[in-house]
Curated annotation (Swiss-Prot):
GO cellular component terms given for this protein: cytoplasm
Coiled coil start-end: none
Organism in which the protein naturally occurs: Halobacterium salinarum (strain ATCC 700922 / JCM 11081 / NRC-1) (Halobacterium halobium)
CDD domains: DRG (cd01896)
Domain OBG-type G: from-to ranges: 62-293
Record's protein name: Uncharacterized GTP-binding protein VNG_1111G
Binding-site list for GTP: 68-75, 114-118, 243-246
Length: 370
């Protein structure tokens, strides 16, 4: 039996097995084996070229993928926000290649990818879906682009991403596995875990762990535990935009918001836009900035003063050392200390080391050996 047939057989058995406490361990093993087989198939297809794909060279400080079914307005949106020139049409399958555009915002260069419109079954390869989804996996943020008239597409889009191991708006499970030489599998938990020991051990054995110490924090489900021991899961934040709001009647607004709630999206979190009329785009840009966690660092350059025109862009939580690494050159090996003025400093020109955590709009001066 080939990998694809094996996967189909496992999926069928899982679907036909009722889930309860007595079948939990069995289903856990089946799901773990399914994840393992899918990972092997993914590696096999990648190794054989996978049918061309959509190789996109990433540029800028962050990459954002616009995800939506055909003709929801992704091309119009990227053209309105960037200097891209994506063909726009009022019919499906207009975008045949990935069209990157660069958004300049608050001194940052944010690459937006207008990927070909997804169709149902993309994760299974329909419409070049696997190649498209592989591009999305490399992004820092995914934006779901929905039509105001087809809110139900959100569930289908989220499912396609989940099926290729993209986990949006989720933290990786806290699962640590350390191999050992003998004595089987020991399970250590924080006291909250509802899965029994047989289920946990069965999942780990399917993953190839025979002798290991596993530490699990929290109370992950079977699926989350499997995520925690797999290497091919990708975690990223997401935003939901609702396009074409210029075309709706005022009386339809309540229906649209109810539809969002029905599909698990708070209307307060959704961003309502009209790409055609360029409405709501400032709100979208600000929300993107926050979701990406970008911050601006103004460099104090010797003899030239503080450069506020072209800030160094790093991520929230990053340190002086991260800034030094991004600056490149010989600065890393010549580094002595740094001085910081701004939100992260206790006072102006505070002397700090490499591990000092920077904040948005800090002024940084690196003192280096000659």
């Amino acid at each position: 039996m080939g990998l694809e047939e094996d996967i189909e057989s496992l999926e069928e058995e899982i679907a036909n097995t009722p889930y309860n406490k007595s079948t939990e361990a069995h289903i856990g093993r089946l799901k773990a084996k399914l994840a393992e087989q899918k990972e092997k198939l993914e590696a096999q297809q990648s190794g054989s070229g996978g049918g061309g794909g959509y190789a996109v060279e990433q540029h800028g400080d962050a990459t954002v993928a616009l995800v939506g079914f055909p003709s929801v307005g992704k091309s119009s949106l990227i053209n309105a926000m960037t200097n891209a020139d994506s063909e726009v049409g009022a019919y499906e399958f207009t975008t045949l290649n990935v069209n990157p555009g660069m958004l300049e915002y608050r001194g940052a260069n944010i690459q937006l990818l207008d990927v070909p419109g997804l169709i149902e079954g993309a994760a299974g390869g329909r419409g070049g879906g696997k190649e498209i989804l592989s591009v999305i996996r490399g992004a820092d943020l995914v934006i779901f682009v929905l039509s105001a008239f087809e809110i139900e597409q959100y569930d289908r889009l989220a499912e396609e991403l989940y099926n290729v191991n993209i986990r949006v708006d989720a933290e990786p499970p806290s699962v640590t596995v350390r191999r050992k030489g003998k004595d089987g599998i020991d399970v250590n938990t924080s006291g909250e875990l509802e899965l029994d020991s047989d289920t946990v051990k069965g999942i780990l054995r399917e993953r190839g762990f025979i002798n290991a110490n596993v530490t699990i924090r929290g109370n992950p489900s079977v699926d989350r535990l499997i995520d925690g021991v797999m290497d091919n899961r990708v975690y990223m934040p997401s935003l939901v935009t609702v396009n074409k709001v210029d075309l709706i009647e005022p009386s339809y607004a309540g229906t649209m918001k109810d539809a969002l709630r029905d599909h698990g999206v708070s209307p307060d979190d959704a961003i309502f836009i009209s790409a055609a009329e360029e409405k709501g785009l400032d709100v979208l840009k600000e929300r993107m900035w926050r979701a990406l966690g970008l911050i601006r660092i103004y460099m104090d350059k010797p003899g030239r003063g503080v450069d506020r025109e072209e800030p160094l862009i790093i991520r929230r939580g990053e340190t002086v050392d991260d800034a030094v690494q991004k600056l490149g050159g010989t600065l890393d090996e010549r580094f002595r200390f740094a001085r910081v003025t701004g939100p992260s400093a206790q006072h102006d020109d505070q002397q700090v080391g490499r591990d000092h955590v920077l904040e948005d709009e800090d002024v940084l001066r690196v003192v280096a050996r000659r």
